Amino acid sequence: MSRTLVLVRHGQSEWNLKNLFTGWRDVDLTEQGHAEAKAAGQKLKARGLKFDIAFTSALSRAQKTCQHILDAVGQSDLKTIRDQALNERDYGDLSGLNKDDARKKWGEEQVHVWRRSYDVSPPGGESLKDTGARVWPYYLHDLQPHVLRGGTVLVAAHGNSLRALIMALDGKSGEEIVKLELGTGVPVIYQLNADSTVASKEVLEG
């Protein structure tokens, strides 16, 4: 039984490039982002991975990343579930703002707290804790059963929705998880035990 879970943050988006808060806004990948997603697929192909099912968010940057990966491994038509439970953290009133402009409006310290604290949310938005409150139950109910049946499951999503998953899988604290940097288009491969605990973890960087 493989019991394999592969997490991939979407490739660079147009708003990543412009240093804007993105959240639930639906923006496209950059040329570099498409290349990162294709490269992720090639890394997974080189490992000989074949997926039983794929999950992604309701946002096109994650969906396109997912499709690039499936194309690379020769599974373009694989069943793919799209659900907003895997969407990026909702940045509320910060969405669409340049991060430097947000610092000018609210102050460097306040914006830093909103971005890098675990349980403080920006106006009208979600904290990382809030994001985890929708991501983890979705994982337990919809994703994990496929893995525990011996499947190989792809999840193409976002920096903060994946942080929320990794926090629970790795047993990290809120303080630890906010410091975790997830590269765009970098696959993280988990092997799970039959009791759902983590047997191994590998990050395919470079």
Swiss-Prot record:
SUPFAM superfamilies from the entry? Phosphoglycerate mutase-like
Its pathway, per UniProt, is: Carbohydrate degradation; glycolysis; pyruvate from D-glyceraldehyde 3-phosphate: step 3/5
**Catalytic residues per the record?**
H10, E88
The site feature described as Transition state stabilizer is recorded at H158
Known EC number: 5.4.2.11
NCBIfam families per the UniProt record, alphabetical: pgm_1, PRK01295.1
* Protein name per Swiss-Prot or TrEMBL: 2,3-bisphosphoglycerate-dependent phosphoglycerate mutase
Organism, by scientific name, is Mesorhizobium japonicum (strain LMG 29417 / CECT 9101 / MAFF 303099)
Gene name of the record: gpmA
